[in-house]
Amino acid sequence: MLIRPAGSEYAAQDVIYKLESNIDDTTGEALGYVMERLLAAGARDVQYSPVYMKKNRPAYLLTVLCLEEDIPALEEIIFAETTTIGIRRVRMERSILKRHIYTIPTSLGDVEVKMCLVPHCNGNEVFEDVEERCYPEYESIKAICKRTGRSYQDVTRQVLRELAENKED
């Protein structure tokens, strides 16, 4: 799907940085701790991917998305908490959908919902009809699950069903 970036009422241009590093000689617990520290220090997203390095050594590729001003603090954490000896840095432009978070009443209680508007596009032409996508926020669903004892999938399905029914009204 091609979305008209700058100037669109539905999407905006953004700049984000990607920090990457290969990490071996570590434990899953250490990687989990590093992820927690990076997210607490401002990382927008953190992920690990399994990779093989030279001499077929298994390792992890650490990928961190962040704003430019957060790079020094995040690199300091990566160097202090991992066995890496280098960090790659890439500046990336991206298009992101505009979104809003609403608190919606449901039969299970109030749920925070992220709403995105996705224009139907054909090349550079943006049509008037727009798809509305709703994503219940994790913390809201988790709180309902803890309170009711129901599964995450069950609660999410019910919330989405109620959102769709209310949209039709």
Task: Show where each model-derived region lies.
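Long, contiguous binding/interaction regions
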Residues: 8, 14-65, 69-86, 91-169
